[in-house]
């Protein structure tokens, strides 16, 4: 893989997450009844950061939950394009405003599986989607409500989101395969 571009460095990522936090507050007329649900793996730490930002702005501590969505894969090939919902703790979503958080939206399949998991847990007041990066190429009619950055990509490129909680650094890069 060859590095094509650095899209966000640490400062730009922090500014982007701060903007998303403000947009969530503005669109929801405050932060009451909001539960942030991060899609594991990188969506969960991003949801925690958004929660911290909202606390700084509104002085309101939000609940942060996670949902584990992953693709069935073996070491050599993809066995299925369908995301698998792994069992995680039940999320109380009843009559709450759910903000689903992920690092990258691509085909929309992961977001769809996460929405299904949330609806299976109860009846939320609403579900909104916040993503750090929207790279296009949707295969389902799913659109993020909050987007950090739109990055037009080819299907041959890889968008790599690195966050300090997992990767020891914060950046978004595009690689050519």
Curated annotation (Swiss-Prot):
Q: Where do we find the motif PRPP-binding here?
A: 98-110
Q: Where is the signal peptide?
A: none
Which top EC class is named for this enzyme in its record? transferase
Give the matching Pfam families: Pribosyltran
What keywords would UniProt list here? Glycosyltransferase, RNA-binding, Transcription, Transcription regulation, Transcription termination, Transferase
Q: What is catalysed by this protein?
A: UMP + diphosphate = 5-phospho-alpha-D-ribose 1-diphosphate + uracil
Q: What is a GO molecular function of this protein?
A: RNA binding
Question: What EC number(s) are associated with this protein in UniProt?
Answer: 2.4.2.9
Domain of life of the source: Bacteria
Q: Where are the transmembrane segments?
A: none
Q: Name one GO biological process term.
A: DNA-templated transcription termination
**Stated role:** Regulates transcriptional attenuation of the pyrimidine nucleotide (pyr) operon by binding in a uridine-dependent manner to specific sites on pyr mRNA. This disrupts an antiterminator hairpin in the RNA and favors formation of a downstream transcription terminator, leading to a reduced expression of downstream genes.
* Quaternary context: Homodimer and homohexamer; in equilibrium.
* PANTHER family in alphabetical order: BIFUNCTIONAL PROTEIN PYRR
For this chain, the family text in UniProt reads: Belongs to the purine/pyrimidine phosphoribosyltransferase family. PyrR subfamily.
What protein does this entry describe? Bifunctional protein PyrR
Originating species: Clostridium kluyveri (strain ATCC 8527 / DSM 555 / NBRC 12016 / NCIMB 10680 / K1)
Task: Write the lineage as a comma-separated list.
Answer: Bacteria, Bacillati, Bacillota, Clostridia, Eubacteriales
Q: List the gene name.
A: pyrR
């Amino acid at each position: 893989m060859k590095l094509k571009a650095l899209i966000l460095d640490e400062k730009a990522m922090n500014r982007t997450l701060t903007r998303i936090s403000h947009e969530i507050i503005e669109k929801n007329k405050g932060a009451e009844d909001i539960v942030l649900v991060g899609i594991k793996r990188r969506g969960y730490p991003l949801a925690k950061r958004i929660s911290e930002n909202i606390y700084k702005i509104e002085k309101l501590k939000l609940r942060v939950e996670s949902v584990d969505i992953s693709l069935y894969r073996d070491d050599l090939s993809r066995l299925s394009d369908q995301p698998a919902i792994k069992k995680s703790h039940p999320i109380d979503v009843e009559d709450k405003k759910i903000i689903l958080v992920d690092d990258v939206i691509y085909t929309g399949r992961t977001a769809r599986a996460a929405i299904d998991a949330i609806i299976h847990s109860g009846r939320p007041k609403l579900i909104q989607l916040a993503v750090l990066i929207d790279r296009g190429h949707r295969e389902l009619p799913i659109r993020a409500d909050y987007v950090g950055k739109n990055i037009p990509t080819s299907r041959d490129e890889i968008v790599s989101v690195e966050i300090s909680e997992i990767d020891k650094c914060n950046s978004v890069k595009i690689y050519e395969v």
